[in-house]
Amino acid sequence: MRTGIIAQKVGMTSVFNDKGERISLTLVKVDDCQVVGHKTLEKHGYNALVIGVKDKKISRVTKPMKQVFANAKISPKTKLKEFRISEEHFIDIATSLEVDHFTAGQFVDITATTIGKGFAGSMKRHNFRGLEASHGVSISHRSHGSTGQRQDPGKVFRGKKMAGHMGCNQVTIQNLKIFAVDKERKLIMIQGSIPGHKNSYLSVKDAIKKISIIV
């Protein structure tokens, strides 16, 4: 199992293939992505690489992290993430990871944070149909209805679908296909959409599940 990389979402575009079919693409940029540290089975109980991206002012780094970056002999990074790996896939500290870490036609898993929607009602948040528009219903047309039962159990059960904060959740989209890799522009073109707003950071790693070909 190889390490993944941290990339930045640039935006979306579309291209046409040989059959005239339109393919939606998400562009992600891989720039200044380096190995910051190692996690070993003997010391930490598992094998992993710590990957960092985007330089950070030294004045904004805590003293413990200053020592970490000093030991790695690299500039401080803004974003850090661990990737579990197998023992044979360790990479030297301070090694840079580029877009050629992946190839066109490969399937990857994308982990990102969804766009925050703020406080949302039940219809937007959970796709409820709402109450009737007339026939005695007033004020509560977009309400979610009853939230509980009676004196017994006398409470609202945990997990009840109600209005609340929507978005800002970490999600993983599996088995997205890489359409092309542009080494000059440091871009990876991925088929389909990816969670998150423009310029947000996400992780790209090899697909963990095999793709079955349907004939």
Curated annotation (Swiss-Prot):
PTM text: Methylated by PrmB.
Keyword set includes Ribosomal protein: yes
Assembly and interaction partners: Part of the 50S ribosomal subunit. Forms a cluster with proteins L14 and L19.
GO CC, alphabetical: ribonucleoprotein complex; ribosome
Organism: Rickettsia massiliae (strain Mtu5)
Role noted for this protein: One of the primary rRNA binding proteins, it binds directly near the 3'-end of the 23S rRNA, where it nucleates assembly of the 50S subunit.
Record keywords, A-Z: Methylation, Ribonucleoprotein, Ribosomal protein, RNA-binding, rRNA-binding
Name of the protein in its database record: Large ribosomal subunit protein uL3
GO biological process: translation
Protein family per UniProt: Belongs to the universal ribosomal protein uL3 family.
InterPro entries linked: Ribosomal_uL3, Ribosomal_uL3_bac/org-type, Ribosomal_uL3_CS, Transl_B-barrel_sf
PANTHER family for the chain: 50S RIBOSOMAL PROTEIN L3, LARGE RIBOSOMAL SUBUNIT PROTEIN UL3C
